[in-house]
């Protein structure tokens, strides 16, 4: 075919030999496998991958209409990229081996003549002790064989090795025997245990009461002299409404006397004044009648038998004829109230314990 001048000017080439027909992937891989040089293999595969990527970019616009074409192109590109990576790894390994060989050759060439002398001396030593060298080499080989052999052998008279028997796992423990007791029977047993503990608590209760009685007996009993000192301190301080337990105790100067004892004695003294007020015409100061303190202490001496320090006294006048009797009644009433309060507290404690036991049974 003859080209015209216009074709030559426009740079048109009508030679069809330049354009080669596309090859299938299997044929391309067969041709690449025949190439011995890794560098040329990589260049061929890179060129083929570039053509596939160009094709994919062209049909990317029509990927919805041509989904299978896109899938095939992507698979071929991924496969060829994996092949390129494998070839590059082989090339790196070859280069590292070549470099190591070159260094070894350089070291061998640079060895001085002194190495030969040391080699000769070591050779003489080796000749002098040949048995020890053989023994050491044999021991090393045996150790290697033992370490490489994953199975352990047993030594028998015939020098034959057999596998070690597998250890059987221990048998599981037998199941616990089933109890024939019903839940109701278990609850009854728990209830009986609770009752036993409750009876035990009741038996121990009198001991606590006796301990409480002993405490009452150990408390202070107020004598006539102690009453006199108490009333004298009240008169000095200005009466029971003004005086404080600490001030009274400091003025009394009695060994072993505490503020609590003086406080309880003062409270009962004030209570007695409220219950039995004296007529103003009959009231006299303690300075007018010197025997007032003696009569006051005698009339209130019976009140010293209560739980806390007591024996209330009138500070500013005389008592009537029934003062001692009324003070004894007050003492009895207070003792009864304390006993009732102790009994109520113990009953409440028992009730709360019973309620807790019932709740535990229900849970």
Swiss-Prot record:
DNA-binding region: 245-270
Biased composition (Acidic residues): 328-340
Ranges of Basic and acidic residues composition bias in the record: 341-363
Listed PROSITE patterns: HTH_MYB
Keyword flag 4Fe-4S: no
Knockout or disruption consequences: Increased number of sepals and petals in flowers. Loss of organ boundary and identity, producing fused sepals, petaloid stamens and branching stamens fused along the filament.
Expression by tissue: Expressed in roots, inflorescence apex, floral primordia, stamen primordia, carpel primordia and ovules.
Molecular functions per Gene Ontology: DNA-binding transcription factor activity; transcription cis-regulatory region binding
Span of domain HTH myb-type: 214-274
Domain of life, source organism: Eukaryota
Gene Ontology BP terms: floral organ formation; negative regulation of gene expression; regulation of DNA-templated transcription; specification of plant organ identity
Subunit details: Interacts with ULT1.
Protein name, per record: Transcription factor HHO5
